[in-house]
């Protein structure tokens, strides 16, 4: 039931995105993320799992964290200023956004089969990717639309995002086995810095938090 609420939230987010209401699309992505969190927590507390639940969860996640942010990027690419050389491709280039949905599905399929990801992640989790795109487009959309130079940069970011989703970069999870500092240094550093970024930058801060998460994960993995 909770998984279906996540799926419905994703469908609503897609609808808002395609109509150009990106703030409401982000709101429904966040609502879907909350349903996804409580769904997983409930399953762990009750010690229940099933094959159909696992498949439904992945389907819901791809809609909420794959198709919805892709639809937001699609809308942004339809209204951005294009460099003159790319203007003839305006009817076609926005559809590149939907590779985000495809790579999100691939990332979720890998996650279901990868036994290494029980206490941490390998590759960028789809909720983090969705929140990055949602907050970036809502918080900095007007800036992105101001100059044609941002349009190809956005396409490059889409490709980087797709790579991160299926990469082999280890990324930490906010799962605490105990609450002490020792062994949780990276998690506490992330949470403290994230709180500061959110206080300073509000919605745009979410994108900065995700960027910080990627950097900190990659840096930690390189040191270990």
Q: Could you describe each region identified by the protein language model?
A:
Residues 39-50, 111-115, 119, 173, ...:
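Cytosolic, membrane-interface loops and tails of multi-pass inner-membrane proteins
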Residues 12-27, 69-95, 136-153, 200-203:
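Helix-coil boundary and interhelical linker segments in multi-pass alpha-helical membrane proteins
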Residues 1-37, 198, 208-209, 220:
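Topogenic membrane-insertion module of multi-pass membrane proteins
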Residues 118-224:
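C-terminal membrane-associated helical module and adjoining short loops/tails
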Residues 8, 34, 38-42, 59, ...:
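Active-site His/Glu-centered metal-binding helix of metallohydrolases
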Residues 11-14, 31, 69, 102-105, ...:
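Alpha-helical transmembrane segments of polytopic integral membrane proteins
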Residues 1-4, 45-109:
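Multi-pass membrane catalytic core of lipid/isoprenoid biosynthesis enzymes
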Residues 2-5, 25-32, 96-103, 129, ...:
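Hydrophobic alpha-helical transmembrane segments of polytopic
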């Amino acid at each position: 039931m909770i998984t279906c609420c996540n799926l419905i939230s994703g469908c609503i987010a897609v609808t808002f995105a395609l109509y150009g209401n990106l703030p409401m699309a982000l709101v429904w992505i966040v609502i879907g993320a909350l349903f996804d969190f409580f769904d997983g927590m409930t399953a762990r507390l009750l010690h229940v799992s099933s094959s159909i639940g696992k498949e439904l969860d992945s389907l819901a996640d791809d809609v909420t964290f794959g198709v919805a942010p892709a639809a937001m990027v699609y809308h942004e690419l339809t209204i951005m200023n294009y460099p003159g050389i790319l203007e003839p491709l305006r009817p076609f280039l926005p559809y590149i956004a939907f590779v985000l949905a495809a790579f999100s599905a691939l990332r979720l399929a890998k996650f279901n089969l990868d036994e290494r990801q029980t206490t941490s992640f390998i590759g960028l989790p789809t909720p983090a990717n969705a929140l990055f795109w949602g907050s970036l487009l809502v918080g900095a959309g007007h800036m992105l639309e101001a100059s044609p130079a941002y349009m190809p940069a956005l396409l490059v970011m889409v490709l980087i995002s797709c790579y991160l989703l299926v990469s082999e970069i280890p990324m930490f999870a906010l799962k605490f086995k105990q609450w002490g500092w020792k062994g949780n240094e990276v998690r506490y550093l992330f949470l403290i810095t994230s709180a500061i970024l959110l206080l300073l930058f509000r919605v745009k801060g979410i994108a900065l938090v995700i960027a910080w998460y990627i950097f900190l994960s990659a840096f930690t993995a390189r040191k270990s």
